[in-house]
């Protein structure tokens, strides 16, 4: 590394070259230069001719320049307030600035970011130019680039249980070339070529599925491994193998993955810390040397800034402060990012955080994928303006894909790349793009955004309206024709001529391409990851406290169950209870590690993103987690042993106490490591939970307690030695039973052992030599190291499961292009002007037109803790202030405001979707006070987050919504016709059989999902529709389709209100009225828009100081620009107050008053029933959806059946024919152990795997319940019914395997009893898992509760300690353990009627029936009662699940 740095410095010295600060090193901005602030004129304190002060400053600079390089680059001169109150320059350590100093410095250089950023960047550039330092530049070329993917044909693409099984078998056979592949190739990018130049900002446009994301990923070296790429990509003539593309460039994904527990600032600081400073330090060294030689003194604040950002490994950096200001995130810098559990930043802020995460690094080529989703047009414009300044001043290479760029944003770009159907339609200067399309015969109309025109002109459905050659008849111009036309156009020919001249590699700047894999040293990477892990642990401290409390409670229970007064010593029978106590301790310390599984899976998405961007190596992520859990592991082990060791009455020796502590600690460490590894291996909750339970099962069963080593089939003995549990169990029993108090002589001549302790060890096949204790400790530590190593390997090589490609059914024999966005048939996408509402077809079902009026609406939430910590006073935070407005039938209203203005909050309040907070004010529906129960029946709410059941198709989603929300008197045929009509309207017919999927994982794209959200509400035939950002995340064409749908809906007489972020001119002017809000939740305009927004423009232009709108400018963007807080402060006005006093508001108040009074002869809304459909139909519809959801969820059900077969066969082999021979006590123990394991582990697997499945559907349930689709009870019943259906089949498979392999009696009665108890057992376990999800906020807490109560059930199952031996004060709980009833039923029904003789060590012979009755309390005549109790358990868990679903709502809105 040092050698490379010296080369760079030498190159700079020789050529005057080393690159500037890359685009982030040029961070910061300047309001006034230091010299401007402290120049001599007038009253400046430094302006007087006092030579002493000037000399003092000169001396300080001279002293600074004489310091060694290392120290000099860490010292800067900043103005400080002296003791006498004067301001003077003081030298400061720039690597250790206090937050106040950082803020002061940022204020000096970047007071008003909108105005000062460009000045500041120029000052940075001027500093490097002044001494002749050249900036590194990157030119990216791609030649003949093609990308292909595999796709399954027809309905085999749907992930049903059947299809996945067949596809898996085919894939396995295909690996061995036994079967040809059934997949076919699909072209995503088709032989494209182009050049991306530095210092020019390029806009990537194209309809959805045109290949934009694939192109950006290919250029950034981030292409999915499952795709095949051909062609060539070079950076400055160098191919990817010659440098590290992930460090040379930065790819900004459209998916926002962040840790919800960290604040915005912490997230950016961590990013900046890991990505490093690139060549900033070498630049500064050379810059400082040259300035000293030339006698140049830099601006002190610029010098301090550049020095501060050039030092790598800092925990916090000024780059973070700069990026926070640049992206407008400084207002939420110390707010948690948030997740499903925590309230955090808004969607728009999250999107900007994703952008900022890569901006804080040193990359000089940036590929940004849809960075404007969820942002208003004003914010998008500002960010793109700052990016343009960065590109032009710092010579950065940048490509940005945007969905709906406003005209003013579009004009910021220098070059355009237009993609369609995987082909390049145009690439070149923005100035020539309209000329090209005119050359092809198409013209962009006036008042039409060029970007919108470009995305529509290649579409088959929209092209004709732009045809300009009236003398020639129109015929469709295909994408291929456009592409060929571009090659003959002058811009295409110029591009071809540039390609003929290869890039001169010799001109490549040595700092342009990065060859080091990571940005900082391994030590600094480890420290950064360690600090973050510690922070995440502190933020999740509740879970760790909960775990510690859990283990404390379990240890208290263990010590009271195995209380020393009940624990006698000296005989073999006494030893059996100690075995149970030791095994139970072991189980708890193992189970306590299972929470690590959920944590690991939860953190993987962010890890995979950061690993692929080379933030850090996998070991740096893994090791801190391992090291920080050691103290926790020790605490848990100490708590357990401190509470249980002497109270249970283990060997009193102090040495044995500490040896048992060591064994517990090693077992806990091994368990944590194992579950971390399994989490990384499984990667999803369902697979990881299944794998975790299977691993537990294997290590437990082979641990030596459930089945003796001597009874394991000889060919499976190797499994015994590979079970970590065996070593933990061996260490504990050797430590206990080789103590002198177990040294009484053995009287049983059939066992070759001297003492009772040795008899106890040998009877279960354990070793009797003391040195085995240390061998076992060594083995446990070895397993800990092995599992951590495997964890790192899994993190290194495995990729996330699932991908973002939609599962769309492609019919064989039909030509379907991925990337063509054209549906079948349909009219041109044109938004109907507001002045001519002709009659519309569609939406013909009868409905009642309703108005909504609201006044003086205020909304408060409890003051967030982080704001209180910052000194904000008050108990409540007000989000809406005296908001008033009216929405009428047939009138389309836009609700507009910048991010944080309270648009979604207002909509949630009006729609009755808030679950918390305090609402004040009046809300009336057609003059009557709003009643939420009836309002839900007549309203629809299209949420911003597009929440749908992931495992059903688009058509099924719509049929389901219509089935439950349309009134019962509409017949099936009419309902289906209506659904077809809505699908036609929203252009969903081509996606009819597509799986919906999970956002960002699989299934529908963002815009397809958005259209589905709208369609789901439209099929309900509502009178009032709320739409929260219906065009967010859509390209211009998709937005136009959506808005045409909305317009058509309004024209049928419905009341529609939409929040909207970045409307184009034609979208904005399709609205009739506007409610404009500013930050703080205040209204600043409420009224009609007028033709071409005339009334809106007149209102704001009448306010003194507001700049006039330019011709052709988007009124929506202009309106947001002139009402920003900075404009308010510049003009010294309050737009909210101006509106309150305006005539527009008086008219608004009159309208509100009019609509708040019921019309004469009208009646309030009334429905005979709360829901549209009766109880039976609700249940039937819910069951129908649940059935298809489960059938198409192979991750859940295929894993469930695979686990059933694997566990069944494993137990069958381990306990082969144990049911036929029960001759001695150990045979009965093995038989009991077989049933105990068979019941507990597969039951626990069912409980664990059902939880994530129920949790996903619960989010959908909250939306559907709020929409008034059904009661909670039919939903609960149907979900349970589907699970019971699968449990029935699962039990059949399991019973046949176990019953035949273990060797039970083949009689009808015994087989029925076995099947019955197994079935009811699996059902209550599944219901128990579902119940915990319904009663807890999320499935992570549900998982912790599950393991906690499973420990109870396990302890009191009757296996670890038989019922007659349980102390009297705990015996009642035996009857409260469902597992105990199941074991009672199975064992008694199979062998409880046998009179065969069993030999008991140390006691003698006894009949099996008597032994079961006296030793275990099992009575054959009690079986019918046991059978009834199983039904009771199922009903208890069913009612608890239904209660949780009906009455508990953990959604926070």
UniProtKB/Swiss-Prot annotation:
Family: Belongs to the ABC transporter superfamily. ABCG family. PDR (TC 3.A.1.205) subfamily.
Keywords from the named record: ATP-binding, Membrane, Nucleotide-binding, Repeat, Transmembrane, Transmembrane helix, Transport
Gene this protein is translated from: ABCG34
PANTHER family (alphabetical): ATP-BINDING CASSETTE TRANSPORTER
Residues binding ATP 1, per UniProt: 206-213
Primary location recorded for the protein, binned into one broad class: membrane
Lineage: Eukaryota, Viridiplantae, Streptophyta, Embryophyta, Tracheophyta
Residue ranges annotated for the ABC transmembrane type-2 domain, each copy included: 524-737, 1177-1391
Protein's UniProt name: ABC transporter G family member 34
GO cellular component terms, A-Z: plasma membrane
Membrane topology: Multi-pass membrane protein
Pfam family, one: ABC2_membrane
Tissue: Expressed in roots at low levels.
Every ABC transporter domain range: 173-446, 852-1105
Source domain of life: Eukaryota
Induction: Induced by cold/dark treatment, 2,4-D, epibrassinolide (EBR), sodium chloride (NaCl) and cadmium (Cd).
Compartments (UniProt record): Membrane
InterPro entries per the UniProt record, alphabetical: AAA+_ATPase, ABC2_TM, ABC_trans_N, ABC_transporter-like_ATP-bd, ABCG_dom, ABCG_PDR_2, P-loop_NTPase, PDR_assoc
Function in brief: May be a general defense protein.
A molecular-function term among this protein's GO annotations: ABC-type transporter activity
SMART domains xrefs: AAA
Residues that span the membrane, as ranges: 542-562, 582-602, 621-641, 661-681, 687-707, 773-793, 1196-1216, 1230-1250, 1289-1309, 1311-1331, 1341-1361, 1366-1386, 1422-1442
Region (Disordered) location: 1-24
